[in-house]
């Protein structure tokens, strides 16, 4: 009888340890958010077939930029990808596995997948553009898919950002 209770207690503790060690979204933010967004874009018939999921993921990856593009590269979703562990995404997705669990499996295959982090966004309403580096000003324009032809000095970049600010900044009411 005591042995049975001990087995139950050990089983409970093992389950508790497993859930506390589970991957959290902030531990692997790019993976979790990208997998969720991709899974939400799939229709029900595609979700059932892992081959269709792989094809859809490759198409999805063509439109990605920055960190998501790098994530696609690591998984093998791009033509230029060196490796391919796409089935580690497609099969669990076809089984309706949650994004956190999928990313946990992907991390075991390739740890650098969870090293991807989103960069902090610059709040244009509160930041003094004059205090930013030219590199940061260029990044703002690049994130907006805008260019600054003929910009040579910091003041030129600031002027261009100020021109485009009303178009891109989200003003809270």
From Swiss-Prot:
Keywords: Developmental protein, Disulfide bond, Secreted, Signal. Pfam families: ARMET_C (PF10208), ARMET_N (PF20145). It is found in: Secreted. InterPro entries: ARMET-like (IPR045333), ARMET_C (IPR019345), ARMET_N (IPR045332), EF_Hand_1_Ca_BS (IPR018247), SAP_dom_sf (IPR036361). The keyword Secreted applies. GO terms for cellular component: endoplasmic reticulum; extracellular space; synapse. One of its GO terms (biological process) is dopamine metabolic process. Belongs to the ARMET family. This is Mesencephalic astrocyte-derived neurotrophic factor homolog. It comes from Drosophila simulans. The gene is Manf.
């Amino acid at each position: 009888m005591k042995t049975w209770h001990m087995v139950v207690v050990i089983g409970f503790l093992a389950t508790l340890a497993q859930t506390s060690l589970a991957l959290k979204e902030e531990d692997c933010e790019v993976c979790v958010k990208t997998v969720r967004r991709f899974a939400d874009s799939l229709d029900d018939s595609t979700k059932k077939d892992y081959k269709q999921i792989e094809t859809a993921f490759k198409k999805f990856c063509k439109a990605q930029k920055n960190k998501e593009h790098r994530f696609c590269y690591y998984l093998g979703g791009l033509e230029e990808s060196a490796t391919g562990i796409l089935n580690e995404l497609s099969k669990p997705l076809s089984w309706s596995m949650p994004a956190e669990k999928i990313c946990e499996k992907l991390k075991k295959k390739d740890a650098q997948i969870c090293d991807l982090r989103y960069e902090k966004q610059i709040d244009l309403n509160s930041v003094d553009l004059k205090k930013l580096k030219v590199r940061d000003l260029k990044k703002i324009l690049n994130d907006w898919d805008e260019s600054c032809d003929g910009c040579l000095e910091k003041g030129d970049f600031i002027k261009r950002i100020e021109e485009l600010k009303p178009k891109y900044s989200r003003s809270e009411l």
